[in-house]
């Protein structure tokens, strides 16, 4: 996290999408994007920026709140108000760089994600304290009837049980099979 920004991750995602589209064996009408946690935030932004190139979006515990909370110098409930002074924030032993914070000030992930017009699958645990379930609830509001939303009761961010992981995987697999092959 020290040398990364959400904007940089989005740029990487766009480059990956371009690469996938350049492959001869890829059916360009059947490209889906999947993301977990901050990767879910990034995936939703890539889909919003490239709506014509993405046919479906799958998100597990998306974490756009990381961006919004950084504007208040908070990261997953941890005060990181010393980030400008130190040049980084210490979050659970990980250095989060000043660039991450500065980048977050100019981003609005939900506004970018709202440009995506296709179907979406959301899976979130109701005991997630890393990325609040409110993030997926907000995405559901944005995407409306185009979004399926599975709440896995008792699951936290890492889905630390076989049953939780199976529910998450089954939901995404059924959705992607339907959207890509149906």
Predicted regions and their residues:
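Conserved alpha/beta-hydrolase "acid-adjacent" motif
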Residues: 129-135
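Catalytic histidine neighborhood in serine/cysteine hydrolases
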Residues: 140-158
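Glycine-rich nucleophile elbow surrounding the catalytic serine of serine-hydrolase chemistry
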Residues: 35-45
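Alpha/beta-hydrolase active-site loop
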Residues: 3-23
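Hydrolase active-site cap/lid region
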Residues: 49-99
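Catalytic histidine-centered segment of alpha/beta-hydrolase-like enzymes
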Residues: 155-168
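Alpha/beta-hydrolase fold nucleophile elbow
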Residues: 25-36
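Short beta-strand/loop motif that positions the catalytic acidic residue
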Residues: 116-117, 122-124, 128
């Amino acid at each position: 996290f020290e040398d990364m920004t959400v904007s940089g991750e989005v740029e990487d995602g766009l480059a990956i999408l371009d690469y996938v589209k350049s492959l001869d064996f890829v059916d360009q009408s059947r490209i889906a994007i999947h993301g977990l946690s901050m990767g879910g935030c990034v995936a939703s932004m890539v889909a919003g920026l490239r709506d014509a190139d993405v046919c479906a979006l799958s998100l597990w515990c998306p974490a756009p709140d990381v961006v919004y909370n950084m504007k208040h110098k908070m990261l997953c409930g941890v005060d990181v108000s010393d980030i400008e002074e130190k040049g980084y924030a210490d979050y659970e032993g990980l250095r989060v760089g000043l660039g991450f914070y500065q980048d977050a000030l100019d981003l609005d992930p939900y506004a970018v994600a709202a440009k995506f017009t296709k179907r979406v699958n959301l899976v979130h645990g109701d005991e997630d304290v890393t990325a609040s379930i409110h993030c997926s609830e907000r995405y559901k509001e944005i995407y409306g009837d185009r979004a399926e939303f599975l709440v896995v009761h008792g699951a936290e961010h890492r889905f630390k049980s076989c049953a939780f992981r199976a529910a998450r995987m089954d939901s995404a697999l059924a959705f992607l099979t339907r959207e890509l092959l149906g």
